[in-house]
Amino acid sequence: MINRKFSRRAIAKQLGSIAGGAAVFGPGFAGILARTPAQTEGPFYPPPPHAETDVDLTLLDGHSERAAGDTILVRGRVTDLEGHPLANARVDIWQANHWGRYAHPGDNNPAPLDPNFQGIGIALTDADGRYGFRTIRPAPYPLSAMGDSGMRPRHIHFKVAHETAGEVTTQMYFEGDPLIADDVVMRGTPAELRHLLITSAVEDAATGLPLHRFDIALG
């Protein structure tokens, strides 16, 4: 059964309000881009069936209360390595909640679950390769629940796929997070490419929310 939240009509409507206008992103450009570095998917992609996968992870159907935490916007463009936009690319995101716990039965973190947080979102890019999500800034979390030591920095998982340009699984990080430098996952990415996975925030003119730009280059 097709999730009604993942229809092209619903995605197009929500992308218009969450991703903003084309002027935010600008036109495509010609040139050779660095391929977005791949990182591990990790063990916590939310298992199906997914009750909701729309682009607003902060508000569930039938709920009057939004997810706990600081609401942010995440927007970007999916392109090939020459900067040409890729329409109809599928963008999956998933992440820990405000307390650092995933909506996954295998997450043994004792932090609380958030009954108002969706945990996963899926979008299709528009004709200009744009996507957009409304979510919350995830918390860092200890690796002890997975039998390891240390902490993971704040991050959002991405899986992006296009029928001709291929796919990448990666993670988006937040500028200024002191945990990035010693992160076991980030250490697996070449130092000269790590900046491609770290985003800074600007204020979104329409909503006043922190806006993180995260572009993906496939090829």
Where in the sequence are the language-model features?
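N-terminal secretory signal peptides and thylakoid transit peptides that target proteins
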Residues: M1-A22
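Beta-strand-dominated extracellular/periplasmic modules and repeats
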Residues: F29-G219
